[in-house]
Amino acid sequence: GVKSVCLLDNEKLNETDLYSQFLAPPDKIGGNRAEASLQRAKALNPMVDISTETKAVDDLPDSYFPVFDIVCATGLKQEQLERINNICRDNNKKFLCGDVWGMFGYMFADLVDHEYSEEIVQHKAVKRGPDDSEKSARETVTITVKRRAIYVPLQNALSADWRKPELRSRLRRGDPSYFVMKILLRFRDEYNRNPDPATRKT
């Protein structure tokens, strides 16, 4: 199970935040979002040690992140996400990131070099009797197979040059939401905020 969790956020809680998460109560508006979420987060599982960090990601040294077995990031700029991901990879730590904009969201996982087990169902022929003329029956057998997955860093996933012939052929088979994600990440990088659903203005 989970031994400990650290909530890292340097932003202040506002009214809009209350529509996207349930950990921070309304009476904590104006306070730090991580600290405002601490009490309800602890109530989810009193056996887990939950702490907070109120510094900005850019103010934390590279040595801060390898302390954790897995780092989950959201609401950050692409450069910040890539920095944290690279630190995690260099220290063989797992990294997840994602975001939600209205009805659209994405999730990225970099588990570096990940081994896992998968159950495979096989059908084997089994003789019903000692006589070769007897019809054989089919028996269902479940076996456990070890698998290995090698992940790529976020920087590689986002820097693919789709003008290259070897990648251009994949465009029709690919998911167009990949490019929506890139546009939204670029918007945040350029304007230092998310698109405003109340207006079309940039």
Regions found by a protein language model. Give the residues of each.
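Adenine nucleotide-associated cytosolic modules
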Residues: 1-202
